[in-house]
Curated annotation (Swiss-Prot):
Regions crossing the membrane: none
Control of this protein's activity: Allosterically activated by GTP.
NCBIfam families recorded: PRK00129.1, upp
One Gene Ontology MF term: magnesium ion binding
Naturally occurring in which organism (per UniProt): Shewanella sediminis (strain HAW-EB3)
Role of this protein: Catalyzes the conversion of uracil and 5-phospho-alpha-D-ribose 1-diphosphate (PRPP) to UMP and diphosphate.
HAMAP family: Upp_B (MF_01218_B)
Keywords tagged on the record: Allosteric enzyme, Glycosyltransferase, GTP-binding, Magnesium, Nucleotide-binding, Transferase
Binding positions for uracil per the UniProt entry: I193, G198, D199, A200
Name this protein carries in UniProt: Uracil phosphoribosyltransferase
UniProt superkingdom: Bacteria
EC number: 2.4.2.9
Lineage: Bacteria, Pseudomonadati, Pseudomonadota, Gammaproteobacteria, Alteromonadales
GO biological process, one term: UMP salvage
Amino acid sequence: MKVVEVKHPLVRHKIGLMRAGDISTKRFRELAAEVGSLLTYEATADFATETVTIEGWNGPVEIEQIKGKKVTVVPILRAGLGMMDGVLENIPSARISVVGMYRDEETLEPVPYFEKLASDMPSRIALVVDPMLATGGSMISTIDLLKDRGCTEIKALVLVAAPEGVEALQKAHPDVELYTASIDRCLNEQGYILPGLGDAGDKIFGTK
């Protein structure tokens, strides 16, 4: 599995700001979208382009545009919504496919509860967004679902990942690409990433 820990100074600075214990909901939400946008930039760097001729201000001009499969952004509810706008900022024509997963706090296993995908999933590249890759369960289950619906090209974008989650995702889906702002130290006994960001969903939605 291709794993990219984005080392760009802007990414490292912004993810550092998100670790503050007293960060406001507004600021956390803004930074989640900003880092999501920067991860999208990295994840789409290998998109193929083609040369076309358009009518410019002073006659015909050759330009490059993206070709091939179109994109669907797949936020994993609810926290993934915090990164969605960052993706759409770069790819405003992307379709939105929503998957609802929550983690059972006792078993730490993902529980699906909602699904609404683009109708043409086999012809789209899926960018799955979720702030945290902890145990990897929610991401793995979401990718299982996308593959069942015919999606063959999938990239996962997460703000922070635990080594345990990276390993689990690699075992389950070695063909997927992972882009993250940081691979952190470990998971604690409650399944939270250390040092991590805390509960990203609560911080994005102001329910902490």
